Amino acid sequence: MSETLERHAFGAEVGRLLDLVVHALYSEREIFLRELVANAADAVDRRRFGALTDPALALPAEAKVRIRPDKAARTLTISDPGIGMGKEDLAQNLGTIARSGTRAFSQSLAEAKPDERPSLIGQFGVGFYSAFMVADRVEVTSRRAGSDEAWTWASDGEGEYTLSPATREEPGTDVVLHMKADADEYLEPLRIETIVRKWADHITVPITLLRDGEEVSGNEGTALWRKPKAEITEETYTAFYRHLTHNFDTPWATLHWRAEGALDFSALLFIPSMKPFLAVEEERESKVRLHVRRMFITDEAGLLPSWLRFVQGVVDTEDLPLNVSREMLQATPVLARIRRAVTAKVLSELKSRAKDADGYASFWQAFGPVLKEGIWEDAEQRDDIAGLIRFRSSAVEGWTSFADYVSRMKPNQEAIYILVGDDTKALASSAQIEGFRARGIEVLLLSDHVDAFWPERLDKFDGKPIRSITQSADDLSAFAPEGESEGEAADLADLVPKLKEILKDDVTDVRASQRLVESAVLLSASSGGPDLQMQRLLRRAGRGFGAGLPVLELNPRHALVRRLAERAKTGEDIAEAAQTLLDLAHVQGGDAPRDPVAFARRVATALAAQG
């Protein structure tokens, strides 16, 4: 053994770290290549920055990171022409965690001008040790720029490392991984290329891969989000969007900006013009990609709330360490501040684009149901989201907003009225709406699945309470019908008590209705309880016990109700008719009769009696 070989024990913290990295820290084994490529690319950036003040550090003309798999030798080599490391650097950066090359280098940049700063440097620190997930021995041969000496650091990750003199013709670093028996896949060029494309496609330093004896490009090499907007064409944005999302449409909106000051990040976000093939309703989490200094970290950082999960893109920050784990991300306040800033930017863009009614309508039809989830989930943004949602209406064609509705309210109208159901056309012809239409009162029609929930969290807009018209408490006496009322109103003094007794197990009340014009009956929700659509959802989910009983409302001017009132007054048995009347109300509201067989029998009997 060479007399110049030096043996050193890892610092105590490294042994613990190795075990953590190999067994717990990283969610995917392929992360090792991301870390090593990032280190190599950052070393190139570091040398490039140093050359600004020391021409002797100038990079070679074609500076690139080279990846060379060797199946015969079972090695994977990552080489770079970067700043390199000397003997002390290797010991300090790879033998302990106490010293951090990145932190030391960051201090030297503290007073540099922004346009002089390269990306903050990923260092041979925590991320480096991920190599031991796939390698049973790692050798790092490095020559520092400006020095003639090269050294090799080597370890099997079992508690010690060695340092020995080496030779390297040019400054830079070679990391050689002796692969474990179960890591054959990482010697396959196509597998390596896939990983590089996934994790490092937009690192600005070129990356090449040795495949079939030839060097091929491994990455695109341009972080589009870091380029000035003026230098990017719409075609380039669209191409990047399609590459990133695997969609084939043109983005409905492109947001590209850089934040500087308290937060330092670049963002390039897209709102698709079409709903993806896999509906966004099925995926609950935002998939905006988090990059740190151009290196992809994760698409599970929650950079946007779930109600903006249709937004795609990249956020690249310099305020996080490159080797931050997904587990650590959730605990850092930096990410929370970025999330708030990005969310505010997207909402601002939507507000601006909402001024173009036709253009906004296309967005709304694709992603409106998802955006409305925010009213239920996000108290902080609830009012802003309320201004962005759109509705069908009983009074106007196309889409309308809360603000538009308020501008059309009748002089003595105090509330915003909504009707929730499964189908807009059915809602527009619903018996629930007859009295409102007769009085010229507009009703907003809500038919998305989420519409049964969010109105519980938004009780008013612009100071106007929001009320479901299926609630029985609405008083329309202040509004005179705009047309002549047809038919004389029946006296229900005898009918109502009898119906209450007959239907006591099925309804909570029976009363005359102000809102019926053409229909004989309708069901409404009792005051203070869930509206009818929520009751339907509870029943469908097997939770009918929480739905409560409806109120049966009667139209005293309808011929059927007048006839029943006469029969009740003369003492006739109206039990069968009462049951049929209630089932008619269910059918009219879009529900099935309580007992379809019994309902059919009663209807057949009634028809036969008329024949």
Swiss-Prot record:
Example of a GO cellular component annotation carried by this entry: cytoplasm
Region (A): 1-326
Region (B): 327-536
Location of the region described as C in the Swiss-Prot/TrEMBL record: 537-611
Domain of life: Bacteria
Subunit description: Homodimer.
Function: Molecular chaperone. Has ATPase activity.
Protein name as catalogued: Chaperone protein HtpG
Organism from which the protein derives: Methylobacterium nodulans (strain LMG 21967 / CNCM I-2342 / ORS 2060)
Lineage, opening ranks: Bacteria, Pseudomonadati, Pseudomonadota, Alphaproteobacteria, Hyphomicrobiales
